[in-house]
């Protein structure tokens, strides 16, 4: 078929607007035929005859005349067995003779495949260059030096020795170099190589071929070809330089030229053009003389550092006289038997006298290449000898290549068994990987299968590495996970080149911008692979005081097993639980600050925070922010008690709990740590910083849960049969009741709630506690156990009140003794015996030498140890407990923890380095004056039986009142505002006043002991941060949080005002006396009395650490109204407004009996502060 130039009008529509008339003229063809047959004279005669102008210049006439070739007759090279052609004129009669059936040459060294481009960029370069621009030659050299995959050159004339040196350098780096030269000017390139003494036949990564211009065929069969005027340099199929610049000295110095540097999609056209030209190319065949000279170069010995040193008649060095790299262009002798020329090893003759020639030896053979280099490995194994060493001189050559890696500045190049790692290949792989990400030239690429072949086949020659700065490789080593630490590299432990997949392809190993454990595996340790805390060598958990991983904290015992993330539990039960959690966080934030006892629903276990703020991955467990109904508490090991000689001695057991370990901090009252904020999605909205004002108080937060446990245990203690102290216990049934109670107040019945996760979780942790009693425990984990037990006891008491109220709807009253007896009988055998062996020993309150009867089967009861200034909490053990009891009297035959005298520790002793200050001794150090709180309804241990008169005088309320009151009971038990003070008077104190030993019974005391004050001085700030904790963990909108923050700040101002302190209460003889008959208000209902009994501990010691209740009900109402006005219709949970309005409407009737439910709800929340004020006035 005719070419486009021979039928220029084909397919054109003459009526089209852009129609271009054909330019072909017949006399052009006839004139050229005349020129080919008769010469220039015949050409001139034909033009004169036709009357046409001359269309060929003298140079063109000379070119046609010089390169005209006669047709190739068949008789000259007759094929074997073919007949002779009788037509001897050779004329084809056509313009398109027979197509060639020869095979197309392949890009045998490989060719990158482009998959996409990122934009297009064109840069124009001129020669001579402007002052602020690089020259075209310098840019070409820079491009060749940056080549990693291929260098393709199409040039009409290549005689620049500097560019030849750059090309050979690239070939020495195993970068394929393809050079297509004009067929007519290729001899000049051979002459240049001859002058530089370069044997082109021995350069493995260099392919030089020739391309001719299009062939023009005449009528008689004669033909001539043109020149190749295409000039471009293609590097890695990513960047192209094209223009009028030729690789000649004259173009650098005297000619003006223009060149463009293309990046992006424009490169694809050059890529295609080069492959087309290469398919039409012919091999470069030097002349016979040139071949003879090249062979002489190959056999001539290399003598000297200069290229022409030792050559007779030559005294000046050539442009390649580089001292170290002269042999690049002048190969050494061939008698070494090398498979490829030694010029590929630039350092072969450099410091050769100081180099070992033996190959490195390693277990399993000479080399252990990666799976991606299997073709090379098979070839090396074929060449290896029986002993696994590479045979012949080639083995020494490879060994020297590997050894020279030790000279390079790779910090872990030679770690392991010798210099086996080939970081030259690693750098090559890394550069290719980064190029595939588009870091340098903004393109993506992968290797063609032939490219894989040469990359794998020659991967083990380290000296073919680029001489450029190793910026890409440094980026790889610095940030990518492909190259791990040197410690992770062991022989046979896995591939050393992670970027290379098993099939040799580049495997992308993308690492996110934040490669921390929580980003890859989520914020919950249960979904992360391999918790370190469960392993024997696992690092201990960090906390807020450990800013860096190097600040390790000793933790005696394994970390708890990770639990499933509660937020991911699907189903309506999980959704309802999360909803109740959000409501609880809202209420705890709204009303815990100032309106803690305004009748609003209380925070649902908002204080149940973990002491260890950060999980093994540097974040808090997601379940810590949830109420216990949605947590599955993990089992924590305990401290096993050891026998000791006495109670007050300095036994070795005391040193165990005081080992430096996890510093206890309040979870959110201290400065927020970014690691904490990353712990979960729900904690990411912590926007308040109101807790900063309580930094000093937050330091004492470590023993808060101990105080809570003391208070709860003391309340639930009562007299059992035989005169022994029987203590109530929590159980899984209590957990079920708690879950029913935890439901919103819209379920007044509350008696048939569905069993939720709480029952299962509490049963699990109870069983785990029983199993781990004897295990050597971690003191850091015991605080969490106390917290869960506290929740159990508190919930059990609340639900027992509810059940008693429903079983006895017509009862006139519920005395404190009746309630406590019921609690003690209901679940006395269900508690795990964890705390019997957990921390301390119980103390008999009557004498120093009278041992306390060991009672119960593992109740979580807490008694203060008062043996000679040892203000430590005690856990008395019941009869039948699987663990030894705890008796701390001198001469006590029972085993127990031996507390040091004056040891300022609570039941959970503070660790060294803990931010919690030590608690001063009870009798050896002065204590700030504490109000005696006669009316605080504090339950203290006394030798006398309580007077039940005031509790029995109240009128009986209707059943509905009791039901609704029980739903609000938790609010009264642990409101936010009061929990800040619960630890102040919460420790039941066995008196050491010399009272006769008698069966101990809980009674309504007029005040707290001094020990309770001193014990709780350090732990007291734990509960003080409850409101801020709930605010921080709330899941509300930002506008509501801003309102709550203001109210919280206002509440802190109130807390900063110290309460009046009537006088010191050191060893007051009134501490153990029961209250008078009229202590309780006569108009209190049964529910209020029960609530007051249960809350007695939390309402005491108001002056401790400058904590007081809000000033008055009017102040709280004012704050609530202020909050409502600030919302401006931005209600988050409108259902809670009902409670606020109820309290506003019913606040005046605090001293009256229960008349209606709305009024009753209001009274429940406001009785206790008024009663407290009454008691204070009586004091």
UniProtKB/Swiss-Prot annotation:
GO cellular component entries: cytoplasm; cytoskeleton
Complexes and interactors: Directly interacts (via DUF1669) with casein kinase isoforms CSNK1A1, CSNK1A1L, CSNK1D and CSNK1E. Interaction with CSNK1A1 recruits CSNK1A1 to keratin filaments. Interacts with KRT18 and probably other keratins.
Impact noted for substituting residue 557 to C: In AI3A; mild form
Organism in which the protein naturally occurs: Homo sapiens (Human)
Keyword presence, Ligase: no
One Pfam family recorded for the sequence: SACK1
Protein name listed in UniProt: Protein FAM83H
One Gene Ontology term of the molecular function aspect: protein kinase binding
Domain notes: All members of the FAM83 family of proteins share a conserved N-terminal DUF1669 (domain of unknown function 1669) domain of about 300 amino acids. This domain mediates the interaction with casein kinase 1 (CK1) isoforms. Therefore, it has been proposed to rename DUF1669 the polypeptide anchor of CK1 domain.
Region Mediates interaction with CSNK1A1 and is required for FAM83H activity in keratin cytoskeleton organization, annotated ranges: 1-286
Outcome after substituting residue 251 to A: No effect on interaction with CSNK1A1 and function in keratin cytoskeleton organization
Disulfide bonds: none
Record note on what altering residue 270 to A does: Decreased interaction with CSNK1A1 and CSNK1E
Residue numbers spanned by region DUF1669: 1-286
Disordered, as annotated region: 484-577, 636-669, 830-1026, 1047-1084, 1143-1165
Outcome when changing residue 274 to A: Decreased interaction with CSNK1A1 and loss of function in keratin cytoskeleton organization
Family, as annotated: Belongs to the FAM83 family.
Modified positions (Phosphoserine) in chain numbering: 513-514, 516, 523, 647, 667, 759, 785, 813, 870, 881, 892, 903, 914, 925, 936, 945, 1003, 1009, 1024-1025, 1048, 1068, 1147
């Amino acid at each position: 078929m005719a070419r486009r130039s021979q039928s220029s009008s084909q397919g054109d529509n003459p009526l089209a607007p852009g129609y271009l008339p054909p330019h072909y003229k017949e006399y052009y063809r006839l004139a050229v035929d005349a020129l080919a047959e008769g010469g220039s004279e015949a050409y001139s005669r034909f033009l004169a005859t036709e009357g046409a102008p001359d269309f060929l210049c003298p140079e063109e006439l000379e070119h046609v005349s010089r390169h005209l070739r006669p047709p190739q007759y068949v008789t000259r090279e007759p094929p074997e067995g073919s007949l002779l052609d009788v037509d001897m004129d050779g004329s084809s009669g056509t313009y398109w003779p027979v197509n060639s059936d020869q095979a197309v040459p392949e890009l045998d060294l490989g060719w990158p495949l482009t998959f996409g481009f990122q934009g297009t960029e064109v840069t124009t370069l001129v020669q001579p260059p402007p002052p602020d621009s690089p020259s075209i030659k310098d840019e070409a050299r820079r491009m060749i030096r940056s080549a990693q995959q291929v260098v393709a050159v199409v040039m009409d004339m290549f005689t620049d020795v500097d560019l030849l040196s750059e090309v050979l350098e690239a070939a020495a780096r195993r970068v394929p170099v393809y050079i297509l030269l004009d067929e007519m000017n290729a001899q000049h390139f051979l002459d240049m190589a001859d002058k530089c003494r370069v044997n082109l036949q021995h350069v493995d990564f260099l392919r030089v071929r020739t391309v001719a211009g299009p062939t023009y065929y005449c009528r008689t069969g004669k033909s001539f070809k043109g020149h190749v005027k295409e000039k471009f340099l293609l590097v890695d199929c990513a960047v192209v330089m094209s223009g009028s610049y030729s690789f000649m000295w004259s173009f650098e110095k005297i000619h003006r030229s223009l060149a463009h540097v293309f990046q992006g999609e424009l490169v694809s056209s050059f890529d295609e053009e080069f492959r087309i030209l290469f398919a039409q190319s012919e091999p470069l065949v030097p002349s016979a003389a040139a071949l003879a000279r090249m062979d002489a170069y190959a056999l001539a010995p290399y003598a000297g550092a200069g290229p022409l040193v030792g050559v007779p008649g030559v005294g000046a060095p050539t442009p390649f006289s580089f001292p170290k790299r002269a042999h690049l262009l002048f190969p050494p002798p061939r008698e070494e038997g090398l498979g490829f020329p030694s010029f590929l090893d630039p350092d072969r003759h450099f410091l050769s006298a100081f180099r070992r020639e033996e190959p490195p030896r390693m277990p399993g053979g000479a080399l252990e290449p990666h799976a991606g280099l299997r073709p090379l490995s098979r070839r090396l194994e074929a060449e290896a000898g029986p002993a696994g060493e590479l045979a012949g001189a080639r083995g020494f050559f490879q060994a020297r290549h590997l050894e020279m890696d030790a000279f390079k500045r790779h910090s872990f190049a030679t770690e392991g068994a010798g210099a086996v790692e080939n970081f030259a290949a690693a750098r090559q792989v890394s550069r290719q990987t980064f190029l595939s990400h588009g870091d340098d030239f903004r393109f993506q690429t992968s290797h063609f299968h032939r490219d894989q072949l040469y990359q794998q086949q020659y991967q083990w020659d380290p000296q073919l590495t680029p001489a450029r700065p190793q910026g890409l490789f440094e980026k790889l080593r610095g940030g990518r996970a492909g190259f791990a630490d040197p410690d992770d590299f062991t022989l046979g432990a896995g591939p050393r080149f992670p970027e290379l997949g098993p099939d040799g392809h580049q495997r992308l190993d993308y690492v996110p911008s934040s490669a921390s454990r929580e980003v890859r595996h989520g914020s919950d340790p249960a979904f992360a692979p391999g918790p370190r805390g469960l392993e024997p060598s696992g690092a201990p958990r960090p906390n807020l005081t450990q800013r860096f991983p190097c600040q390790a904290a000793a933790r005696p015992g394994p970390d708890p097993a990770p639990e499933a993330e509660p937020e991911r539990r699907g189903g309506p039960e999980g959704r309802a639980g999360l909803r109740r959690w959000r409501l609880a966080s809202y209420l705890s934030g709204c009303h815990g600050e100032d309106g803690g006892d305004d009748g609003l629903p209380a925070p649902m276990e908002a204080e149940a925070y973990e002491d260890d703020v950060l999980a093994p991955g540097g974040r808090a467990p997601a379940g810590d922010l949830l109420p216990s109904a949605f947590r599955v508490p993990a089992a924590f090991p305990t401290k096993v008690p050891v026998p000791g000689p006495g109670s007050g001695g300095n036994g070795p057991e005391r040193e165990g709990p005081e080992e430096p370990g996890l510093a206890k901090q309040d979870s959110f009252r201290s400065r927020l740590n970014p690691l904490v904020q990353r712990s979960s999605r729900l904690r990411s909205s912590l926007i308040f910083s109101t807790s900063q004002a309580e930094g000093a108080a937050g330091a004492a937060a470590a023993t808060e849960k101990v105080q809570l446990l003391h208070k709860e245990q003391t309340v639930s203690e009562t007299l059992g049969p035989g005169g022994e102290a029987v203590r109530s216990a929590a159980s899984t049934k209590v957990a079920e009741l708690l879950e029913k109670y935890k439901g919103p107040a819209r379920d007044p019945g509350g008696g048939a709630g569905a069993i939720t996760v709480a029952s299962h979780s509490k049963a699990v942790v109870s069983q785990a506690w029983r199993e781990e009693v004897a295990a050597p425990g971690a003191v850091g984990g015991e605080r969490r156990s106390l917290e869960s037990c506290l929740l159990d006891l508190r919930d059990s008491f609340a639900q027992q009140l509810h059940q008693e109220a429903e079983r006895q709807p017509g009862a006139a009253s519920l005395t404190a003794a009746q309630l406590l007896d019921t609690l003690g009988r209901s679940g006395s055998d269900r508690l795990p015996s964890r705390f019997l062996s957990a921390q301390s020993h119980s103390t008999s309150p009557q004498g120093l030498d009278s041992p306390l009867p060991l009672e119960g089967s593992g109740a979580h009861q807490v008694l203060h140890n008062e043996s000679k200034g040892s203000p430590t909490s005690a856990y008395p053990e019941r009869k039948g407990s699987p663990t030894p009891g705890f008796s701390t009297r001198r001469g006590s035959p029972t085993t127990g923890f031996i507390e040091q005298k004056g040891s300022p520790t609570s039941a959970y002793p503070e660790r060294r380095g803990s931010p919690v200050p030590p608690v001063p001794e009870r009798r050896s150090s002065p204590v700030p004056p504490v109000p005696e709180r006669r009316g605080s309804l504090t339950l203290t241990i006394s030798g006398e039986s309580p007077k039940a008169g005031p509790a029995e005088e109240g009128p009986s309320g209707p059943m509905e009142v009791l039901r609704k009151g029980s739903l609000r009971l938790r609010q009264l038990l642990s409101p936010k505002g009061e929990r800040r003070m619960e630890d102040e008077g919460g420790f039941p104190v066995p008196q050491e006043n010399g009272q006769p030993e008698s069966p101990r019974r809980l009674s309504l005391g007029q005040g707290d002991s001094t020990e309770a004050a001193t014990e709780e001085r350090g732990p007291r700030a734990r509960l003080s941060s409850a409101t801020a904790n709930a605010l921080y963990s709330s899941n509300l909108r930002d506008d509501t949080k801003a309102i709550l923050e203001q109210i919280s700040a206002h509440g802190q101002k109130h807390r900063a005002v110290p309460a009046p302190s009537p006088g010191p209460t050191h060893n007051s003889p009134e501490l153990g006396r029961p209250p008078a008959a009229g202590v309780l208000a006569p108009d209190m209902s049964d529910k209020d009395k029960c609530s007051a009994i249960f809350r007695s501990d939390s309402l005491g010691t108001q002056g401790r650490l400058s904590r007081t209740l809000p000033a008055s009900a009017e102040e709280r109402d004012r704050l609530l109204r202020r909050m409502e006005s600030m919302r401006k219709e931005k209600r988050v949970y409108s259902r809670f407004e009902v409670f606020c309005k109820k309290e506003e409407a019913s606040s005046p009737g605090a001293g009256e009996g229960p008349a209606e439910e709305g009024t009753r709800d209001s009274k429940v929340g406001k009785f206790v502060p008024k009663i407290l004020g009454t008691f204070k006035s009586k004091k």
